[in-house]
Structure formats: C-alpha cells, structure tokens
Amino acid sequence: VLSPGDKSNIKAAWGKIGGQAPQYGAEALERMFLSFPTTKTYFPHFDMSHGSAQIQAHGKKVADALSTAVGHLDDLPTALSALSDLHAHKLRVDPANFKLLSHCILVTLACHHPGDFTPEIHASLDKFLANVSTVLTSKYR
C-alpha cells in the first residue's frame, strides 16, 4: 500500500522526469534486453540495436503507461485494466519480467537524477513499480 508520503514522492519524482519519460522508457528497455537477454523473446520482430525506432516507440508506451499510473495512484487496477488484459491474455508475458523491467527503470532514473534519487524516493518508486507489476499480473489467474 502506498502511503501519502509515497504518493507525494512518486508525483514529485515523476514531475522531475517530465518530457524525458519516453527516452528513459526506451533506455530502461535497452538496459533490460542487454542485462536479461531472455526478455528479448517477447520482441522477436524488434530491431534490438541501440536507439532503434521500435525500442523508442515501446519505451514511449511504457512511459505513457507509467504516467497514467502516476495520475491514478489511488486506483491503479482501473487505470491499468486494459494493459493488464493485454499482457495476461494476448501477450502472455512472464510475470517475472515486470520485476526485471522495474529494476531497469529504477537504475535508469538513478543514473539520470542521482541528486534526486534519495533512499526515500527510491523506496517509494520501488513500491510504486511493484504495485504496477502486481496490477499487470493480476489477470493471469
């Protein structure tokens, strides 16, 4: 459960990310593909080269979904329902991959905003990404 302090930290951190979110999403995906090569199996049609248009486009989708989630911290299941259906029923992504991507998102944000990435912000963002992952895997049953 996200505390009021967590929600405040998440909104503040996301506000500092601003227009860089799509680039950070793409960077986090590239980081995940390089660090955890098995995750590439869900993207066989992607050009995996650095900065490819497909990775950039999917990074924007990831960032947009997270921005939606930040705007609906009190009702993530409703806000992410369609995305949850897509990942559970059509894409059938292994739920473990959400944890891997979450880690790569945290690393990416820490690299770009080291002064703002305090232990409190890190903890709040980690809880937020864990909640998003839980919602995205909730319809797998």
Curated annotation (Swiss-Prot):
Keywords, comma-separated and alphabetical: Acetylation, Heme, Iron, Metal-binding, Oxygen transport, Phosphoprotein, Transport
Modified residues (Phosphotyrosine): 24
Amino-acid positions noted as binding heme b in the UniProt annotation, renumbered to this chain: 87
Residues binding O2: 58
Tissue expression pattern: Red blood cells.
Any single GO CC term annotated in Swiss-Prot or TrEMBL for this entry: blood microparticle
Start and end residues of each Globin domain: 1-141
Annotated InterPro entries: Globin, Globin-like_sf, Globin/Proto, Hemoglobin_a-typ, Hemoglobin_oxygen_transport, Hemoglobin_pi
One MF term in the entry's GO annotations: oxygen binding
Modified residues (Phosphoserine): 3, 35, 49, 102, 124, 138
Gene3D superfamilies xrefs: Globins (1.10.490.10)
Keyword Transcription: no
PTM annotation (Phosphothreonine): residues: 108, 134, 137
GO biological process: hydrogen peroxide catabolic process
N6-succinyllysine modified-residue sites: 7, 11, 16, 40
Subunit-level organization: Heterotetramer of two alpha chains and two beta chains.
PANTHER family found in the cross-reference section: HEMOGLOBIN FAMILY MEMBER (PTHR11442), HEMOGLOBIN SUBUNIT ALPHA (PTHR11442:SF48)
UniProt function note: Involved in oxygen transport from the lung to the various peripheral tissues.
Record-stated family: Belongs to the globin family.
Name under which the protein is recorded: Hemoglobin subunit alpha
Source organism of this protein record: Tupaia glis
Recorded name of the encoding gene: HBA
